Amino acid sequence: MTVEDIFTGIAAYLRGFLAGAPPWVVTLAIGVLYLIGVLAFIFLNALYLIYLERKISAYMQQRIGPNRLGPHGLLQSVADAVKLLGKEDIIPRGADRWVFIIAPVLIFIPATMLYAVIPFGKGMVPADLNIGVFYFLAVASTTTIAILMGGWGANNKYALLGSMRCVAQMVSYEIPLTFSILGVIMLAGSLQTSQIVAAQGKIWYILLQPLAFIIYFIAATAEVNRAPFDLVEGEQEIIAGPYTEYTGMRYALFYLSEYANLVSVSALAVTLFLGGWQGPWLPSWLWFLIKVYIMIFIFMWVRWTFPRIRIDHLLSFNWKVLLPLSLANILVTGVGIKIYQLLTLGRW
């Protein structure tokens, strides 16, 4: 039995095991099981990717990186997590207490919800919605609320400035990000992530939509606050931005959400442009993970290669370059589809 068979058989097994129970009980049980799997995936990825990024940055800067705990420093992230668990939970004087407390939880919830529509392999989609891409974009946009709450609730000018930067940056770059995805949707004729992957059986959309992929990558880098667009927490200017006053596990939730979002935007890029789980010989889930980690490596490589840019240059580049290019890509895609229909089907 393959991993795909196990994944797709979970729902059938639970329905048989809970035969006679109300439908909502079965649905709830399946949802809880999928949630546990997604949370385990997020936590394991965060531990591994933090270590990987530190090693990659060390290699690019001719350093060694973590090498003390475990073989080649593999347990360094575990030690950091244990350290954060033991940190004192501090709430600043004058802070808006409940806003300050709730913000880290609110940013982690949408970061988890994004994985509901990610096709991890053939038949391995937790919730294969017919509006999957729209769901992903809608849920991802809510993270700005939590970051703004964190900056406001801390009663710190640097935190508030960082959160305001975040809102300006993420709201601006959501537009070309969405427009870059529209070209793929036009080609696939569906918003369902599994159908978009299936439509790339003959050719990956990165070959048909290279400009859209570049726009998506740049906009996604800004959306997840990765360098060179990490102005939300520019250390030299505003310390840690909206995370300045957070300690312990509250800070860890922000950090965990950052890597969860990095994996999710990489997974969406693989789904939309790189053929998703499709590939020869290897299992579908393994192909998907390989492509996702290649995308993550590219994000990390960009972070440690390019310098941080100014906020005015960041926003100007979005409105004057990315947005017109994304609109032009939609126009060219639409014309190309019509020409293809005319040549192959004989109709306009």
From Swiss-Prot:
A Pfam family it matches: NADHdh
Cellular compartments annotated: Cell membrane
GO MF terms, alphabetically ordered: NADH dehydrogenase activity; oxidoreductase activity, acting on NAD(P)H, quinone or similar compound as acceptor; quinone binding
Transmembrane helix found in the keyword field: yes
Coiled coil: none
Gene Ontology terms describing biological process: aerobic respiration
Keyword flag Cell membrane: yes
Regions crossing the membrane: 1-21, 24-44, 98-118, 131-151, 171-191, 203-223, 253-273, 282-302, 317-337
Cellular component annotations (GO), alphabetically ordered: plasma membrane
Membrane topology: Multi-pass membrane protein
Group of enzyme by EC: translocase
Keywords: Cell membrane, Membrane, NAD, Quinone, Translocase, Transmembrane, Transmembrane helix, Ubiquinone
Similarity section: Belongs to the complex I subunit 1 family.
Official protein name in the record: NADH-quinone oxidoreductase subunit H
Gene: nuoH
